[in-house]
């Protein structure tokens, strides 16, 4: 950026020198014509007897004559003529009904079919800001004439951003990295979904040097990262237990769903989670998903029934377990087997360690500068339910934290950078994913901003069907299109861009009694 700015300034200086040189050269040349004409008039000025002397084209002679009286008059005349031409062109562009476009057609202001057009300079400055890299603090959206185009800090837009770009369109390099640099400059918190772990490798030290608390939830290599126990945030809250249950069931279905089996497994899982969370004989470090999986796999159905029958009738875990118990023995065996299959990733010792205790505080980003990296796998989805759980609980905890803070906002603004958004899993406890849509529409007032990046609109439609994808995009006031290779995304962006009315000239020939009568027709 700095090199480009220096080159731009150097180009301006060189162009100014060349322009002044050309002006003085032409002024001196025209000044010689004035001088020679004056001499010719003083000698009689008779055509055919004497001739006007030709000017000397030598640059040195022209530059010398530029400082004579006739040279000054010539320079003034050239400046006046040039200014007149510029004023004429500007006035013609402003008041003309039509404007020529660089793409090879003439735009019509009639607006018969539409008035879509690129932003004018005035319109751009009313919504966005132009700044140098050294002074830019807002979200960087692009570059225009050597200046950065940014979303200003005092904007009325909601700051949510949707990025569309196929592989290789530089989503990470051109947009997300710049967003992280701006976040550091503003002193805000960031939570980054990192599918390739490249963001952590490239930017984590920069965050640390700027006083950030840096954590990493590594779902690809759990041994090299911090731990997060999702059950540490329950604290007996049955609604949070329901969210946990729904997220796990919703993100371990492998694209297939059977309400009968899903509901049975959800009831059993919720009962086990609440049993573990409210067991006063268990130390806090054992209240985790690994222990829930141990209860499921180390006890028979009869043993589980005896355990739950010992609970008081009003215990929160009794109701979901009683629903599970209504099934036949064959169905109960199928439910236990199905739930065990969903949670089989907990057989891995590294994953058990990952979910056993918490190094990560979900409310900390709202109180002081934090940078949390969630490293995701872009190859398989067995750990997707953990990333979905993390962001689902994050929205709930941060929103509640903001509501209890002065002004109903997070003291430190929080930015969620969701690269490869579709790899995260379905966020929220609602089976259809509508919880994320609702969260996106209300978190702006809590100073929580979301930037999500997808490769295509089709991906988003598959993850959030039934027009939920439209709600998500509709809640993003900023939409960046970096490139696409599919018709769905291309058609959507084209429709959003609108239609422009252009001028069309055609010639019609009317044959009347075999005598051609041509007519020219212009329209738009």
Identify the residue ranges that each predicted region occupies.
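Single conserved hydrophobic/aromatic residue that forms the stacking wall/gate
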Residues: 513-524
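Conserved H-loop
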Residues: 455-456
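Conserved P-loop NTPase catalytic core
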Residues: 468-496
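P-loop NTPase motor domains
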Residues: 27, 144-145, 152-448, 463, ...
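Basic- and hydrophobic-enriched, low-structure N-terminal and domain-boundary segments
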Residues: 1-169, 173-178, 186, 223
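Short, glycine/polar-rich helix-capping loops at beta-to-alpha or helix-loop-helix junctions
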Residues: 460-469
């Amino acid at each position: 950026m700095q090199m480009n700015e220096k080159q731009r300034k150097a180009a301006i200086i060189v162009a100014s020198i060349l322009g002044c040189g050309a002006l003085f050269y032409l002024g001196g040349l025209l000044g010689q014509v004035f001088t020679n004409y004056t001499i010719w008039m003083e000698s009689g000025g008779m055509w055919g007897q004497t001739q006007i002397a030709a000017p000397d084209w030598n640059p040195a002679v022209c530059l010398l004559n530029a400082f004579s009286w006739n040279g000054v008059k010539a320079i003034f005349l050239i400046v006046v003529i040039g200014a007149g031409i510029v004023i004429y062109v500007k006035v013609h562009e402003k008041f003309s009904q039509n404007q020529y476009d660089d793409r090879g057609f003439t735009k019509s202001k009639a607006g018969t079919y539409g008035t879509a057009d690129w932003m004018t300079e005035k319109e751009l400055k009313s919504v966005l800001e132009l700044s140098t890299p050294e002074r830019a603090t807002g979200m960087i959206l692009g570059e225009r004439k050597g200046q950065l185009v940014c979303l200003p800090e005092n904007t009325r837009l909601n700051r949510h951003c949707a990025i569309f770009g196929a592989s290789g369109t530089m989503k990470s390099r051109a947009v997300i990295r710049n967003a992280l640099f701006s976040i550091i400059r503003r002193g805000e918190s960031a939570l980054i979904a990192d599918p390739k772990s490249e963001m952590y490798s490239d930017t984590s030290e920069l965050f640390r040097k700027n006083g950030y608390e840096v954590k990493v939830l590594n779902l690809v290599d759990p041994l090299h990262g911090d731990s997060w126990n999702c059950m540490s945030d329950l604290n007996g809250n049955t609604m949070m237990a329901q969210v946990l249950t729904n997220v796990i069931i919703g993100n371990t279905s492998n694209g297939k769903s059977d309400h009968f089996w899903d509901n049975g497994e959800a009831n059993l899982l919720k009962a086990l989670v609440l049993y573990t969370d409210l067991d006063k004989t268990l130390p806090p470090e054992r209240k985790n998903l690994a222990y829930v999986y141990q209860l499921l796999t180390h006890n028979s159905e009869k043993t589980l029934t005896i355990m739950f029958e010992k609970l008081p009738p009003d215990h929160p875990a009794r109701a979901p377990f009683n629903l599970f118990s209504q099934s036949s023995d064959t169905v109960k065996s199928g439910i236990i087997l199905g739930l065990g299959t969903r949670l089989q990733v907990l057989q891995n010792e590294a994953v058990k360690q990952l979910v056993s205790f918490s190094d990560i505080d979900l409310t900390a980003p709202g109180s002081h500068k934090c940078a949390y990296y969630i490293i995701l796998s872009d190859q398989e989805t067995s750990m997707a339910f953990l990333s979905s759980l993390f962001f689902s609980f994050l929205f709930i905890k941060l929103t509640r934290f903001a509501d209890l803070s002065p002004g109903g906002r997070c003291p430190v603004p929080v930015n969620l950078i969701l690269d490869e958004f579709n790899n995260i899993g379905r966020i929220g406890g609602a089976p259809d994913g509508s919880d994320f849509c609702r969260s996106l529409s209300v978190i702006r007032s809590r100073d929580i901003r979301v930037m999500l990046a997808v490769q295509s609109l089709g991906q988003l439609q598959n993850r959030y069907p039934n027009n939920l994808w439209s709600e998500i995009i509709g809640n993003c006031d900023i939409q960046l299109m970096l490139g696409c290779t599919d018709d769905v995304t291309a058609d959507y962006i084209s429709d959003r861009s609108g239609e422009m009315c252009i001028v069309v000239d055609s010639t019609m020939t009317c044959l009347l009694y075999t005598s051609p009568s041509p007519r020219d027709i212009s329209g738009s």
